């Protein structure tokens, strides 16, 4: 399995935008759709009424989660999204764009504040819980609100899927500071990240998804 560092992945995505004219929005749409198709094919092919919970951050990983939620909803899945709002300021960029799309498509999205009781109740009987909180840009110690959210997700008896990398895990070193999402499956976007292969006990089974990177870029890795 080919792996990349977080820096190399950012370079590939930047090259896709600047050299091949692929908009970042297109890459995110492709990633979210690929994840939705994988979930449908592997877990929901016979019963789409099982509950799916997607918990998003306000960065790129959260955007992937919102896109995935929209596609699952359009396919008739019982899906609910939660999102941790920015500590300061407001939503920006692709996350804001996909929140608007979620609103117009009637996808259920709730913000997570200090009271986690609603999230606890939701994940308690969920069939699948998806971690779309923190991505490859994360380094260091997990902030309190994210830490508490991760603990709630880990308490669920559901199938647990991490988008790109489990939240709390360093994408390069595979280290964590204690608060880390423990996945049964990790859906690596484009390429598996180096840290995943160093933390297989946390990442579970790694599945690499196509996010629409040009063949010319894929061949350089």
From Swiss-Prot:
Enzyme class label: isomerase
Listed GO CC annotations: P-body
UniProt KW Ribosomal protein keyword: no
Cofactor binding description: Binds 1 potassium ion per subunit.
Domain YjeF N-terminal: 9-219
UniProt keyword list: Isomerase, Metal-binding, NAD, NADP, Nucleotide-binding, Potassium
Domain of life: Bacteria
SUPFAM superfamilies per record: YjeF N-terminal domain-like
InterPro entries: Rhodanese-like_dom, YjeF_N_dom, YjeF_N_dom_sf
Binding-site residues, (6S)-NADPHX: 60-64, 135-141, 146, 164
Pfam families (UniProt xref): YjeF_N (PF03853)
Reactions catalysed, as given in the entry: (6R)-NADHX = (6S)-NADHX; (6R)-NADPHX = (6S)-NADPHX
PROSITE patterns listed in its UniProt record: YJEF_N
Biological process, per Gene Ontology: deadenylation-independent decapping of nuclear-transcribed mRNA; P-body assembly
Necessary cofactors: K(+)
EC number: 5.1.99.6
Gene Ontology terms, MF aspect: metal ion binding; mRNA binding; NAD(P)HX epimerase activity; nucleotide binding
Binding site for K(+): 61, 131, 167
Function comment: Catalyzes the epimerization of the S- and R-forms of NAD(P)HX, a damaged form of NAD(P)H that is a result of enzymatic or heat-dependent hydration. This is a prerequisite for the S-specific NAD(P)H-hydrate dehydratase to allow the repair of both epimers of NAD(P)HX.
Family: Belongs to the NnrE/AIBP family.
Protein name: NAD(P)H-hydrate epimerase
Organism, scientific name: Elusimicrobium minutum (strain Pei191)
